[in-house]
Design a protein with these regions (language model features):
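Short, positively charged
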Residues: 2-186
């Protein structure tokens, strides 16, 4: 599919996707863990450590892919992505304010746990054929949740369908949210 060219820098699709996932997780972490409130898109950049963190993520070698400066120029890739990050965290904060959450990104423990389980139990190796989520937000204790999922998957008869059902129930009860990082429209 060729390399996406972003702000005149060539970068592989996979590398860019990984950056987006880390950036989303980072913004969510600032919002959830560090209690940063972003009332509008610009606030993400006004918060120095969020801005610095995002710029560190969107860097390939010595190439700075995104620079986040104010005012945000509309219709630029930066504008599109900041808006996406903003809308995601806004929607989630609305649903989950005042709770105790842990945010896991693609490099995090829960992702490894669930991918490992699916691989071991159902012989599905690639994360994307069974597409869970790019980021998980877990309410309460991650280890208790993992234990619960693990014990419900013990025994022989379980199918991936049952795991999905369980994850869906957890989602309905707002104990676990999986976020997929497709761009969120304005």
């Amino acid at each position: 599919s060729g390399m996406p060219n972003i702000n005149n820098i060539n970068i592989s699709e996979a590398e860019f996707t990984a950056m987006q996932e880390r950036a989303t997780a980072f913004v969510l972490q600032r919002a959830f863990k560090d209690n940063k409130r972003f009332a509008k898109v610009e606030d993400i950049i006004k918060d120095k450590s969020t801005k610095d963190g995002l710029e560190k993520i969107f860097k390939s070698g010595n190439n700075q892919i995104f620079k986040f400066n104010l005012p945000v120029q509309s219709k630029t890739p930066e504008d599109t992505w900041l808006t996406t990050f903003f809308l995601q965290q806004q929607r989630l904060l609305k649903e989950f304010s005042n709770s105790n959450f842990t945010v896991f990104n693609r490099d995090g423990g829960f992702m490894n746990f669930i991918s490992g389980l699916v691989k071991r139990k159902f012989n599905i190796s690639k994360k994307d054929t069974w597409n869970p989520a790019d980021i998980w937000i877990i309410k309460g204790s991650p280890s208790i949740l993992q234990q619960e999922i693990k014990s419900s998957m013990e025994g022989l008869g379980q199918t991936i369908h049952e795991l999905n059902t369980m994850l869906r129930t957890k989602y309905t009860n707002r104990e676990l949210i999986g976020i997929s990082l497709k761009k969120t429209g304005k």
